[in-house]
């Protein structure tokens, strides 16, 4: 099985990374894909949003898995992976992960510890989605070193130019030095309030500024109070409000991501002839 590893990254917090990771993951599962979600944020937002309100009480989290790799200790198959009723698996995170980030600074092959862990799981999943922490620290670098694709959620309420440039520069550095397979799938506009001209202007400006170099997804995720309610419920927007506009947005994004994969496969097949 050719596993697609997608990092959901933006060093700014509050842009919809966790929501996108959970709902795109569950959207892919509904489309028949075998999906693992990785929470690589010590705050454990993805872990909490998928029904684990106390990540610190979980017996095994990502920091334990990465610790085993660091210490060259064996991992049992699927150890610590939780199953969510909507058809995805989850490797949870807790605050111990911030200690792991400190340990990585002096470790050998420090940028590839997460990649080495994911290599033990690759054949079991068609898709692995990584929810990155809101920083460009060692955990995010590990996620980018492990991924072959990046999706960048951007909130449509402000112009993200400076932060976006930093992220793009980090992605190109990781691609150049560590992971030549890394590609940007696109920029995803989130929390879009189409009632305001400002949101439309930001969207137009993003497409104008980056559209020639980087795809800006045709799908935009609308702003919704209902979407904000679900993080306490432990379920996706598809289970919470299946006919709402946010569920429709994530359904469309899922189709766009699958279409992109098919296009890439086609062009790879064409090149290899």
Enumerate the predicted regions with their spans.
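P-loop NTP-binding core
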Residues: 1-273
């Amino acid at each position: 099985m050719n596993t697609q590893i997608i990092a959901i990254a933006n060093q700014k917090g509050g842009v919809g990374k966790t929501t996108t990771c959970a709902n795109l993951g569950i959207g892919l599962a509904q489309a028949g894909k075998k999906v693992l979600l990785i929470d690589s944020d010590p705050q454990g937002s993805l872990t909490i949003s998928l029904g684990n309100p106390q990540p610190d009480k979980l017996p095994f989290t990502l920091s334990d898995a990465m610790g085993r790799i660091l210490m060259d200790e064996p991992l049992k198959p699927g150890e610590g992976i939780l199953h969510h009723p909507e058809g995805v698996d989850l490797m949870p995170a807790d605050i111990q992960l911030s200690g792991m980030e400190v340990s990585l600074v002096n470790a050998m092959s420090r940028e590839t510890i997460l990649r080495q862990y994911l290599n033990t799981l690759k054949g079991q999943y068609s898709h692995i989605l990584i929810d990155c922490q809101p920083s460009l620290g060692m955990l995010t670098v590990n996620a980018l070193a492990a991924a072959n694709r990046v999706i960048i959620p951007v909130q449509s309420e402000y112009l993200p130019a400076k932060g976006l440039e930093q992220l793009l520069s980090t992605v190109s550095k990781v691609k150049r030095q560590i992971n030549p397979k890394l590609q940007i799938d696109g920029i995803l506009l989130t929390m879009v309030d189409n009632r305001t001209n400002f949101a439309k202007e930001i969207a137009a400006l993003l497409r104008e500024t980056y559209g020639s170099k980087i795809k800006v997804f045709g799908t935009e995720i609308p702003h919704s109070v209902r979407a904000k309610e679900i993080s306490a419920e432990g379920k996706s927007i598809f289970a919470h409000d299946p006919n709402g506009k946010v569920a429709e947005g994530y359904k469309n994004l899922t189709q766009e991501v699958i279409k992109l994969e098919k296009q890439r496969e086609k062009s790879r097949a064409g090149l290899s002839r």
